[in-house]
């Protein structure tokens, strides 16, 4: 090891770095965080800061770089965003009171999900850490947003359920046991994508150890007191313990705002697998993963960041119990029908900051004076909101109003203790309000008076000495001093004590000046210490009431969501759906919420839908591409989901029989990374639907079988439709769109299947898609007309018409379609078979011309082929 690394400071650095080899170490050195060696090389490149070195131009050069400690957060955020962990190492002793090397230690490790500073968080999104573990078939999940204190856990009976949870939570960081991290199942890896993955040692998955962590954090005697049954929810218990262990390793501090653990039972919510969430674009679009253009973007008119996050959670976890859905609908209805109340509520909510995250920072001792002031200003809105809701009649509105705690004691404390416009840094001074503490007020008076005395002394000394340029100044090295220029040195009095020679003159002190310096500086030092102590006391007293703040924040967030849904319903003429436990799903004049809201320059054509377990169990939808089949099917799924969220829906009337699951299969891309083609993905997703769907499910299938040959695809689509209709455990309410027109024949043999098609008008060799869903089956696909609309070259369109005409008329030469304009038939061989064909050629040709292939069933085609073979 080089001698440069043998200094006491560098030895200390290397010891601490060895404990955090996977992190970039921010090593506190006075007013800077410094990075050394490889960390410096990485950080300087990513942060675009100067890389320098200790022992420059020697064989023992040590690369290093640094950032100011008071502005380190943006730099930490950039490193975390780039995929690095950052270990923050602080001086844990006061350098002024320490001889020799200052003690240092890591106080926290910042990872993607352990960021709590507001600048590094997306306001309208949770920042979840999700832990996953398994024991055989069962999986445990626990997820925590450290910035808000939301902590949830769940068990899943299978891998598909774990993938569904992962998709719905969309964590910023995954936490896995070592073995699972090395061998993550493909189903989870696909959903996890490129999210950062942290690991805990496999030994952490010990029930006794995890139970101890849980009991310690939540102050209970056993996990069962939180509802975590050791047998029934053992995997959830282990996942929860993983999260707490990870926090213990990386935060090095108590987390009092983690007060509650919510157990999520999957049968309490509408199940939406990853493919369905993606296909319905619930919270982000498929094309660019943006909120705009998604259902969330369409419905989000919330006034607070808390409300925006809560709306996203509601959309991710729709309800399946009628009573709570109706409570939400009644609340939305009252706010919709009372615009004055809605406006007043929204106006007050605009004055509410992110209470959940403010409360988190206060509890973790990370809040500054401005945070406490923001907390105060937010709580100031609560009495007005309670007053506005006094006359509310909807049970949910009344219950939420009761949850609103004005926290008058905390508001008064902050208002009295914290200055109206506190500085950013706690050490700048001026954070405590005048009049709050008698000793502090006295010290401030001394400081102000002392500074005034210094100013008066400067004027007096100028008069006494006749030196008009004499100045009294201050720096940290010499304290207060008198500065005299060279030209006036002959006028310096005898009582001046010289302290320093500078280029422009001399610096002096006097006994009187030093006496006042001690008084003033002593007061200022004491002011800083006292202010910091008082602020900590105020912050701790506020943190002690964090539970009350948390409940109020949750109620405000729910009110914000209800007001947002009411506003959207009012502006877009949505109706209140009737939600029940029946099997009927009936939508009158339904519209697609997102497509309608985007207002693409044309009126959205509404359509009716009826699904039940009798004559309308499976709707077989045929029709041309671009006619609106996919939009129609998605809108039915979205309207169902919106109703179960508790939202009004885009229709003139709707009755929604609760769905336990929604499945969609509406297209896939090649998954080359897993060696799976479009068709393989399509078949896997369809198989999952057939295994999982129940009579209470809603299934949306679009163009099953299109990824393989025509006969294979038709056969698979036919069998899937029969299975969904005939299999008792899987008789799901189904929308089945297909380009195989032969499937329309199923309606003749199965009473639960109804044929629907999209109305089309042909005019002057043009096709007009009317977007209206009508009873019946399509006879044409209008593919060439769609190609024309897509801008295909004219000569390609004309040639396609010729080929289509040839195929439809069944014109054959030598037993093959005559597709080549200039083809010349090869010489015919004289065989008995040829002679036989020639003798019956006219009869066969006439028979083939009359065929209408587009309406033949597979069985009819096979029978005809057998007949023609016998004729030949």
UniProtKB/Swiss-Prot annotation:
Keywords: ATP-binding, DNA damage, DNA repair, DNA-binding, Nucleotide-binding
Provenance organism: Trichlorobacter lovleyi (strain ATCC BAA-1151 / DSM 17278 / SZ)
Residues reported in the UniProt entry to bind ATP: 623-630
Record protein name field: DNA mismatch repair protein MutS
A molecular-function term among this protein's GO annotations: ATP binding
Taxonomic superkingdom: Bacteria
GO cellular component, one term: cytosol
SUPFAM superfamilies referenced in this protein's UniProt entry, alphabetically: DNA repair protein MutS, domain I, DNA repair protein MutS, domain II, DNA repair protein MutS, domain III, P-loop containing nucleoside triphosphate hydrolases
Stated role: This protein is involved in the repair of mismatches in DNA. It is possible that it carries out the mismatch recognition step. This protein has a weak ATPase activity.
A Gene Ontology BP annotation from the UniProt entry: mismatch repair
Taxonomic lineage: Bacteria, Pseudomonadati, Thermodesulfobacteriota, Desulfuromonadia, Geobacterales
Pfam family, one: MutS_IV
InterPro entries cross-referenced by the UniProt entry: DNA_mismatch_repair_MutS, DNA_mismatch_repair_MutS-lik_N, DNA_mismatch_repair_MutS/MSH, DNA_mismatch_repair_MutS_C, DNA_mismatch_repair_MutS_clamp, DNA_mismatch_repair_MutS_core, DNA_mismatch_repair_MutS_N, DNA_mismatch_repair_MutS_sf
Family per similarity comment: Belongs to the DNA mismatch repair MutS family.
């Amino acid at each position: 090891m080089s001698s440069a690394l043998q200094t006491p400071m560098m030895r200390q650095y290397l010891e601490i770095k060895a404990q955090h080899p996977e992190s970039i170490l921010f090593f506190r050195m006075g007013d800077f965080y410094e990075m050394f060696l490889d960390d410096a090389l990485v950080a300087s490149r990513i942060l675009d800061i100067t890389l320098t070195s200790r022992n420059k131009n020697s064989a023992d050069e040590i690369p290093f770089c640094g950032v100011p400690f008071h502005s380190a957060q943006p730099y930490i955020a950039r490193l975390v965003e780039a995929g690095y962990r950052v270990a923050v190492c602080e001086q844990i002793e006061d350098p002024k009171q320490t001889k020799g090397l200052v003690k240092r230690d890591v106080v926290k490790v910042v990872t993607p999900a352990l960021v709590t500073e507001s600048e590094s968080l997306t306001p309208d999104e949770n920042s979840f850490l999700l832990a996953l573990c398994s024991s055989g078939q069962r999986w445990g999940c626990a997820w925590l947003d450290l910035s808000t204190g939301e902590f949830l856990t769940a068990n899943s009976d299978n891998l598909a359920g774990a993938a569904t949870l992962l998709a719905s939570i969309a964590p910023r960081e995954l936490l896995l046991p070592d073995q699972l991290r090395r061998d993550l199942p493909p189903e989870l890896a696909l959903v996890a994508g490129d999210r950062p993955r942290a690991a805990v040692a496999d030994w952490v998955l010990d029930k006794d150890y995890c139970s101890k962590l849980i009991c310690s954090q939540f102050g209970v005697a056993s996990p069962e007191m939180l509802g975590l049954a050791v047998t029934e929810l053992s995997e959830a218990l282990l996942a929860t313990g993983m999260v707490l262990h990870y926090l213990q390793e990386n935060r090095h501090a108590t987390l009092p705002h983690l007060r509650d653990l919510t157990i999520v039972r999957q049968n309490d919510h509408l199940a939406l697998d990853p493919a369905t969430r993606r296909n319905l674009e619930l919270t982000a679009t498929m094309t660019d993963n943006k909120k705009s253009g998604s259902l969330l973007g369409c419905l989000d008119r919330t006034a607070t960041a808390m409300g925006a996050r809560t709306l996203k959670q509601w959309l991710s976890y729709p309800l399946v119990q009628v009573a709570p859905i109706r409570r939400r609908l009644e609340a939305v209805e009252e706010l919709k029908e009372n615009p004055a109340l809605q406006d007043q509520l929204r106006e007050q909510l605009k004055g509410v900051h992110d209470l959940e995250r403010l409360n988190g920072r206060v509890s973790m001792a990370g809040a500054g004076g401005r945070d406490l002031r923001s907390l105060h200003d937010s709580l100031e809105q609560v009495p007005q909101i309670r007053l506005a809701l006094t006359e509310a009649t909807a049970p949910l509105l009344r219950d939420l109003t009761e949850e609103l705690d004005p926290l008058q004691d905390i508001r008064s404390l902050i208002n009295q203790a914290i200055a109206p416009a506190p500085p950013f840094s706690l050490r700048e001074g001026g954070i405590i309000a005048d009049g709050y503490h008698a000793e502090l007020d006295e010290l401030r008076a001394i400081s102000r008076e002392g500074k005034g005395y210094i100013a008066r002394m400067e004027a007096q000394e100028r008069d006494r000495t006749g030196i008009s340029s004499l100045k009294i100044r201050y720096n940290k090295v010499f304290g207060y001093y008198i500065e005299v220029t060279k030209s006036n040195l002959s006028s310096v009095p005898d009582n001046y004590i010289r302290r320093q020679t500078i280029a422009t003159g001399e610096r002096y002190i006097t006994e009187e000046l030093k006496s006042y310096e001690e008084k003033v500086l002593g007061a200022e030092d004491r002011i800083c210490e006292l202010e910091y102590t008082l602020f900590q006391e105020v912050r701790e007293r506020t943190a002690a009431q964090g539970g009350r703040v948390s409940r109020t924040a949750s109620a405000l967030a729910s009110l914000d969501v209800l007001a947002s849904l009411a506003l959207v319903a009012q502006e877009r003429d949505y109706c209140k759906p009737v939600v029940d436990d029946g099997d009927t799903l009936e939508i009158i004049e339904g519209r697609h919420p997102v497509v309608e809201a985007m207002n693409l320059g044309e009126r959205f054509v509404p359509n009716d839908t009826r699904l039940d377990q009798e004559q309308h169990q499976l709707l077989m939808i045929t029709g041309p591409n671009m006619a609106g089949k996919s939009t129609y099917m998605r809108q039915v799924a979205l309207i169902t989901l919106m109703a179960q969220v508790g939202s009004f829906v885009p229709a003139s009337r709707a009755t929604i029989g609760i769905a336990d699951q929604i499945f969609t299969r509406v297209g896939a891309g090649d998954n080359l990374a897993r060696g799976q083609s479009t068709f393989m993905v399509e078949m896997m997703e369809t198989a999952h639907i057939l295994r999982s769907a129940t009579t209470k499910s809603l299934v949306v299938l679009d163009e099953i079988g299109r990824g393989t040959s025509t006969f294979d695809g038709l056969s698979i689509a036919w069998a899937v439709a029969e299975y969904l209709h005939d299999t008792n455990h899987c008789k799901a309410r189904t929308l089945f769109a297909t380009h195989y027109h032969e499937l329309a024949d199923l309606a003749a043999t199965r009473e639960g299947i109804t044929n629907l098609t999209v109305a089309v008008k042909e005019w002057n060799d043009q096709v007009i898609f009317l977007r209206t869903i009508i009873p019946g089956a399509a006879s044409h696909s209008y593919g060439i007309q769609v190609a024309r609309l897509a801008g295909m070259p004219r000569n390609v369109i004309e040639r396609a018409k010729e080929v289509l005409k040839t195929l439809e008329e069944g014109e054959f030469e030598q037993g093959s379609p005559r597709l080549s304009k200039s083809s010349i038939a090869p010489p015919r061989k004289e065989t008995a078979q040829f002679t036989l064909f020639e003798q019956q050629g006219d009869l066969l040709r006439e028979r083939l011309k009359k065929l209408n292939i587009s309406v033949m069933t597979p069985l009819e085609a096979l029978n005809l082929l057998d007949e023609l073979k016998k004729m030949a």
